[in-house]
């Protein structure tokens, strides 16, 4: 089996040749897989771009006042790019959950790469206000590092980022505990990013966590932090705790509190007031529905709700205010960490897909597991979220394959077809996937900007996905850059 010569590794290298460099270290580079390729005529690409511009304006302007971009697989679908593209038409871009475990890679107009983790992907657009909502968890040192990296690369963050006073603080001790927890689990480890996300949400649920607003009361901050340290000591034998450690941490956060103060806001009030003022809000989800604490492949999930319900609880806005929700899905499937993956490809097939798609985690650099597009899981995500449309990303990565496959149903070992996505992991791990095989396409589609210019086989692939899940594909990604997007 062979894959595309024009892959994301080549596109990223071309972008890096432009002015400036990325402020965040890129994931480990993988060798390209190169094959002869038929290129689309340049003139056709130019005319297609003109048609695409009109369609793009129509698509984006038609989005509702409060819209959302959510992942519909196991993360890493390319949500950040779509948010970056849509952001100029919105007044506010808001993160509703998660923390620095999210990794959103975007490129500015000059091709400079930015790897964002907590700061919303709308930050590259000067007129956009970025909000980190109450459902997120904030590692303050990491937050400042991200801001410093942005500003050192010419991105103005002054007065453009607000953090909810209700958001919980993620401390270094949460990260230490995360590593200890994974070590305890040994062979059954979940495969977290070890960024402390789970332990921080655990502190929130057990009600001994500290919130951003606690930084405004340093007279009691130390006592509250002491409770948190003692709890970690009692639960993890390897966690060291001393009074001097506590004093050092309190002094450190006194300095952080002064710098963070201009960013702190009652974002619940701000967002609801903005809705009253008819301002447009774009919600940027982190992770994805298949990692949802309730609906994902538990326990191999994140600790928050990256599905539609998390928008309301993570921002404090009413369900009736939410309009269009766009589900972002790769043209194939990837997963980082442990957990069942029914359509996973092993050996040479999986390796080639990983190399062509540059499938290495933005946050951890870990190689992603790769497989065919899982229609059963995608339909499940569409049901839960009520997506109004889909953004199919990385379609170009499949170029060069003689055939492409869609996992259309699950059968139990006895041959009986499952009627829904199973919540029982024992069942999920034993399913036999039934595939639908479609013809592949050989031509390079990375310069295509009009749907009609795509090879017929690629169009058929897109349309078959629409038929199977019952949701239209409005956006198609054919490369990492802002302009590498087809509006259907």
UniProtKB/Swiss-Prot annotation:
One of its GO terms (molecular function) is adenylosuccinate synthase activity. Its cofactor is Mg(2+). Pathway: Purine metabolism; AMP biosynthesis via de novo pathway; AMP from IMP: step 1/2. It comes from the Eukaryota. GO terms for cellular component: chloroplast; cytoplasm. The keyword Transit peptide applies. Its EC number is 6.3.4.4. Keywords: Chloroplast, GTP-binding, Ligase, Magnesium, Metal-binding, Nucleotide-binding, Plastid, Purine biosynthesis, Transit peptide. PANTHER family: ADENYLOSUCCINATE SYNTHETASE (PTHR11846), ADENYLOSUCCINATE SYNTHETASE 1, CHLOROPLASTIC (PTHR11846:SF19). This is Adenylosuccinate synthetase 1, chloroplastic. It comes from Oryza sativa subsp. japonica (Rice).
């Amino acid at each position: 089996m062979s894959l595309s010569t024009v892959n994301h590794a080549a596109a990223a290298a071309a972008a890096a040749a432009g002015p400036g460099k990325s402020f965040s270290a890129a994931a480990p580079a993988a060798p390209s897989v190169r094959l002869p390729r038929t290129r689309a005529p340049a003139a056709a690409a130019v005319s297609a771009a003109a048609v695409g511009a009109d369609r793009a304006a129509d698509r984006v302007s038609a989005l509702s006042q409060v819209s959302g971009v959510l992942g519909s697989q196991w993360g890493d679908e390319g949500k950040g790019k779509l948010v970056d593209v849509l952001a100029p038409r919105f007044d506010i871009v808001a993160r509703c959950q998660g923390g620095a475990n999210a990794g959103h890679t975007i490129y500015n107009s000059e091709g400079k790469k930015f790897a964002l983790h907590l700061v919303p992907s709308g930050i590259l657009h000067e007129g956009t206000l970025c909000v980190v909502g109450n459902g997120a968890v904030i590692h303050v040192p990491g937050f400042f590092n991200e801001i410093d990296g942005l500003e050192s690369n010419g991105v103005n963050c002054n007065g453009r980022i607000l953090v909810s006073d209700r958001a919980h603080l993620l401390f270094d001790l949460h990260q230490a505990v995360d590593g200890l927890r994974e070590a305890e689990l040994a062979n059954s480890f979940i495969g977290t990013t070890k960024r402390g996300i789970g332990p921080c949400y655990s502190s929130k649920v057990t009600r001994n966590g500290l919130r951003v607003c606690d930084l405004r009361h340093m007279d009691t901050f130390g006592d509250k932090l002491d409770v948190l340290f003692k709890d970690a000591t009692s639960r993890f034998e390897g966690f060291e705790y001393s009074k001097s450690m506590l004093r050092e941490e309190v002094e450190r956060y006194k300095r952080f509190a002064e710098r963070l103060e201009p960013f702190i806001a009652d974002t619940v009030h701000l967002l609801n007031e903005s809705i009253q003022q008819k301002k447009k809000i774009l919600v940027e989800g982190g992770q994805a529905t298949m990692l949802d604490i309730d609906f994902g492949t538990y326990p191999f999930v994140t600790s928050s709700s990256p599905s539609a319900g998390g928008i309301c609880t993570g921002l404090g806005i009413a369900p009736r205010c939410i309009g269009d929700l766009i589900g972002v899905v790769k043209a194939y499937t990837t997963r980082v960490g442990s957990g069942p993956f029914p359509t996973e490809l092993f050996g040479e097939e999986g390796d080639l897909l990983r190399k062509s798609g540059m499938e290495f985690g933005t946050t951890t650099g870990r190689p992603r597991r790769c497989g065919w597009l899982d229609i059963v899981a995608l339909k499940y995500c569409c049901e839960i979220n009520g997506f109004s449309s889909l953004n199919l990303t990385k379609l170009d990565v499949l170029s060069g394959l003689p055939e492409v496959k869609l996992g259309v149903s699950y059968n139990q070992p006895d041959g009986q077809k499952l009627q829904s996505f199973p919540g029982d992991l024992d069942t999920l791990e034993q399913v036999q996937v039934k595939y639908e095989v479609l013809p592949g396409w050989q031509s390079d589609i990375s310069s295509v900007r009009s749907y009609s210019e795509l090879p017929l086989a690629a169009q058929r692939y897109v349309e078959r996905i629409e038929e199977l899940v019952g949701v239209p594909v409005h956006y198609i990604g054919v490369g990492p850059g802002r302009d590498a997007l087809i509006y259907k």
